[in-house]
Amino acid sequence: MLLRTKALIRSGGSIAKYAAANPSCFILQRRGLRREFGPKYTAKINEAEENWQARAEAIKKGKKQNTWDLFEERGYVKDTAGTKEHIAELMRTRRIGAYVGIDPTAPSLHVGHLLPLMPLFWMYLEGYKAFTLIGGSTAKIGDPTGRLKSRDHLSSSDATMNMTKIHYQLKKLWENVDTQMRARGYEADWARKRGIVNNNHWWNKQPMLEVLRRVGHALRIGPMLSRDTVKNKMTQGDGVSFAEFTYPIMQGWDWFELFYQQGVQMQIGGSDQYGNIISGLEVVKAARESEPDPQERKYVTPKTALDECVGFTVPLLTDSSGAKFGKSAGNAIWLDPYQTSVFDFYGYFVRRSDQEVENLLKLFTFMPISEITKTMEEHIKDPSKRVAQHTLAREVVTLVHGKQEASAAEDQHRMMYTGQMTIPQVSRAKDAATGGDQYKTISDQPVTLNNAPRIDMILPESLIMGKSIGRILYAAGLASSTTEGHKLAAAQGCYVGGAHRAGGENVTMNPDLISFMPVKLWFPGETQRYLINGNLLILRKGKHNVRVIQMVSDVEYAASGQTYPGQSFTGAVRKLNEIMKNLKEKKLTPEEAKNAVNELQKSSQEKQQGQQIIFPEEKSRQKKDMETKLKQEMIASVKTIDGMMDEKPSVRGDGVKKQTQDDRDPYKW
């Protein structure tokens, strides 16, 4: 969400003087919104500034490392917008803000996104302000950089799906960075800030005419046409559209909005983003000079070189074979555990060569250089143990998926390659999860970003449009039954995503502004009002248990082979009757029918495992009797094939099978 920051300072004292000298460090809110800080807050700001100046003095005397020097030491810097000396001095003296922008053109981040994010995470650890920008609006245009063919147009529902999933991936990364910060012993710093911002927040309100009026005159087509990426697309590709020409302007305006609202003076980009960063600097400069409000112009207009914006790009990484880093057999290594399993993700880093592993430890971990040196010394003693590779894999998986998943994945790999027979499963067994198992939570643990179930799913139109919200919550795995789903909705214990537009009955949710409001009991026909783009429903239970549900036709859902909890005609009794029918019609042999029954029983027993039954402690004898009976029922075999053939189901006069006591018993077929 867009973080609201503090307004201009009109009060007296040292803060006002510092604000006048350093306008970018005290952030403007929307025009005309100014307020004074109270004495306690003023004292906190003064203390934070004094601490930062003490830090700057320690860096000057060589007692502490400059963060820019850390970047160069670890290999994060490729091209710079601004001299290295200027950037180093800026980072020494100012608690600047920095950002990395990501367009949600795919449903997940991949390993390649981690490289520009790592210096941003380091800045956060060192006490700066760090922001990740989701390009909800710029993704609709598509960055032409490095492409010969224009990106395929994203539908509104796909864009919303991608935007939501990437938002939660970034939240997960930031929480894991916080965990690493505490584990590495970084001191608490009140002025340290981080945030996730979506450029939909201003592009949905900002007229393009106003943007062009303020910055259009400062940009020239010639320099844009002279870039290699544009030349290649025009001569070897499908040409550059007018929309793609506007992309650098939109990206530059994003930077200005972040500067205006959060004091962001630095942009960090991938190896191919240098041209966009240079264009962004021109847009920010033009926007600052064309500020229409005279009162605010004196604050946004740069007074010294340290008020100017800067940027840099990270290098392009390739592995020992020359392939682009983050690819395996031509496929991206995704951060989504359901697209690249935790086991495979860990394995990708374990397979790195000895020649590249030290560099990767510097780039993708928060390990101090001294610790990396010791790891490499231990690795050299016996390279076959792959000590450095396992350290790299463990650190990266901890950052992306959490410590518990990293430990489990490490155990899996070590036991697999040491010949042990028993291989432990990762905590949520994401690697083996299929169908409805991907949406289950751990019964005895709270849902966190690291153990949350899969977000995206499909459900049939007949359910979404024709059933109650309680049934939908049950089908989505957010409730254990339809009854619980109704109770959740009645108590407003779950939420629907989107910004509802006031108006007619059929006016649907706004796909560009994803916020959440409590779910209420509504008629099945009203669900349509909460769909985004007519086919996307976003639900949330708790803080992190989210479902982005794509509504598909019943035919398409049936073709997918999936089922959902509470789906009609999928019960065990009905499946058994179907086996009996196929047997009598000789579509199955007795042996095939027996195997089908055994599979059905096995599936039922697997579903029942892990569902803990709690017995009253005061009735110890009753508890023992019930536990014994339950165990007997769960391991009892079904009737023999001959018995099934001889038995005739009870049938009413209308030909419909009556429900017998065995049908009602959940532990019998």
UniProtKB/Swiss-Prot annotation:
Consequence the record notes for mutating G127E: Splicing and aminoacylation defects (mutants C-18-1 and C-18-2)
Major location (coarse): mitochondrion
Full protein name: Tyrosine--tRNA ligase, mitochondrial
Composition skew (Basic and acidic residues), residue ranges: 616-627, 645-669
Catalytic activity, EC: 6.1.1.1
Gene3D superfamilies (UniProt xref): HUPs (3.40.50.620), RNA-binding S4 domain (3.10.290.10), Tyrosyl-Transfer RNA Synthetase (1.10.240.10)
Alphabetical UniProt keywords: Aminoacyl-tRNA synthetase, ATP-binding, Ligase, Mitochondrion, mRNA processing, Nucleotide-binding, Protein biosynthesis, Transit peptide
Binding of ATP, residues: D103, K327
GO cellular component: cytosol; mitochondrial matrix; mitochondrion
Positions occupied by motif 'HIGH' region: 104-113
Positions of L-tyrosine binding: Y99, D143, Y247, Q251, D254, Q273
Residue span of motif 'KMSKS' region: 324-328
